[in-house]
């Protein structure tokens, strides 16, 4: 993989009562466009996941996306549910994420803190960049906050790149949550 790439892997961003028109599904930012993923995008998205895993491993985060996660089956499930998105720059897929409005089961229990609000939220998962262009995380966050005004997200304690992107955008650190299997994640939320 490209050693200069900046890859972000994200688990969990949540939603708010002000749900905006997510069905349109396309937002442009400069040369970047965000659209819903299709099954035709799977090969490119899986390549981005591979690049993200390589980046994370090379930067001290060897365990966040282990054991084949995220795999093609979860990606197909996201696509079929309308929750998978790609970020396209000049016709090329340069990033991907999952965005789900509604309750995230792993967010029901939070330790060492609390959520800012208990209203409806959107959750960002599986955010990854090809490393070809900068600003993928910011583009994702800006898109999601236009869909609903309350977002939640979580990341691994070793994913310093993602923590930096989350905090730079203005997310508030809320505490710790535990994903399926019991692994701890740092939990954040953002209200626009």
Regions found by a protein language model. Give the residues of each.
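Conserved active-site alpha-helix within GNAT-family acetyltransferase domains
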Residues: 158-175, 183
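Conserved acetyl-CoA-binding loop-helix of GNAT-fold acetyltransferases
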Residues: 132-146, 164-168
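Conserved GNAT-fold acetyl-CoA-binding loop/helix
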Residues: 53-73
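Conserved beta-strand in the GNAT
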Residues: 86, 92-102
